[in-house]
């Protein structure tokens, strides 16, 4: 019985903690959702520009390295 309890107790604790988390969570209102969506979009754009400029810098470097052989 002790072996079963050692498996079941962590699962029971996890389920209890999960239920408590879900009860504490709330749906964002329109203002909060808009704020999060705008910040996420800005992050995507910034990361896109970083990737674009890195690619823009490394294309000529790669051509120099490959063209030298």
UniProtKB/Swiss-Prot annotation:
Q: How does it sit in the membrane?
A: Single-pass membrane protein
Principal cellular location given in the protein's record: endoplasmic reticulum
Q: Which residues carry this modification: N-acetylmethionine?
A: 1
Q: Please name the GO terms of the biological process aspect recorded for this protein, alphabetically.
A: intracellular protein transport; protein targeting
Q: What are the protein's GO molecular function terms?
A: protein transmembrane transporter activity
Cellular location(s): Endoplasmic reticulum membrane
Extracellular side: which ranges?
62-69
**Membrane-spanning residues:** 33-61
Top-level taxon of origin: Eukaryota
In this entry, the parts of the chain located on the Cytoplasmic side of the membrane are 1-32
Q: Which GO terms describe its cellular component?
A: endoplasmic reticulum membrane
**Record's keyword terms, sorted:** Acetylation, Endoplasmic reticulum, Membrane, Protein transport, Translocation, Transmembrane, Transmembrane helix, Transport
Give the matching InterPro entries.
Answer: Prot_translocase_SecE_dom_sf (IPR023391), Translocase_Sec61-g (IPR008158), Translocase_SecE/Sec61-g (IPR001901)
Known role: Necessary for protein translocation in the endoplasmic reticulum.
User: What HAMAP family is this protein classified in?
Assistant: SecE
Record text on subunit structure and interactions = Heterotrimeric complex composed of SEC61-alpha, SEC61-beta and SEC61-gamma.
Q: Which family does it belong to?
A: Belongs to the SecE/SEC61-gamma family.
Q: What is this protein called?
A: Protein transport protein Sec61 subunit gamma-1
């Amino acid at each position: 019985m002790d072996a079963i309890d050692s498996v079941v107790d962590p699962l029971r604790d996890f389920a209890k903690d999960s239920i408590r988390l879900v009860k504490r969570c709330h749906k964002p209102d329109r203002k909060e959702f808009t704020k999060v969506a705008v910040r996420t979009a800005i992050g995507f754009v910034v990361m896109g520009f970083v990737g674009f400029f890195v690619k823009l810098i490394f294309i000529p470097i790669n051509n120099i390295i490959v063209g030298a052989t």
